[in-house]
Amino acid sequence: MLIVEDEILPAMALRDELEDAGYHVMDLTDRHQEALAAARGRKPDLALVNIELQGHDDGIELARELKAMGVPVLFISGQVSRARSAQTVAIGSLPKPYSALDMVKAVDYLLRHQAGDESMAPPPGLEVFDETAPGLKPDPV
């Protein structure tokens, strides 16, 4: 798991909650280039990306680059309309404010969904965008 978030305290709380749930958070950053370097070093199963990052970095552009590397992205941003406008570069969005528990449920759902497990319903608040993104299988017809 890779967390790219400009607000350090919520990002640390999110990291702790995900790790308590059994996930490994490989890196926590607030910068575009640091996130890319981390993803190149060890490809994460999922990147949680805020749209507005430090130094005027753009999370949508980061998501585009991560997708090209085969890393699925979940937007974690209060900018719902911007997230929806960029749905081709992310697999979904969980808008702020969200609880750490909501995020764990969203991650559980997305990782199971990527593995083809359709037994879990998407948690409230999670908007799934492109079900044919890398690693995601389309729903059966």
Question: Which residues are covered by each model-predicted region?
Answer:
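Conserved acidic carboxylate
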Residues: E5
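Charged docking surfaces used in two-component/phosphorelay signaling
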Residues: M12-D20
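Acidic, metal-coordinating helix/loop segments flanking the phosphotransfer/catalytic sites
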Residues: R15, L28-L46, I51
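Conserved phosphotransfer microenvironments
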Residues: V49-K67
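Hydrophobic/aromatic residues positioned on beta-strands within the core alpha/beta folds
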Residues: I76-S77
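A Lys-centered signature of the CheY-like receiver
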Residues: K96
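Receiver (REC) domain switch/active-site region of two-component response regulators
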Residues: S99
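CheY-like receiver
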Residues: H113-V141
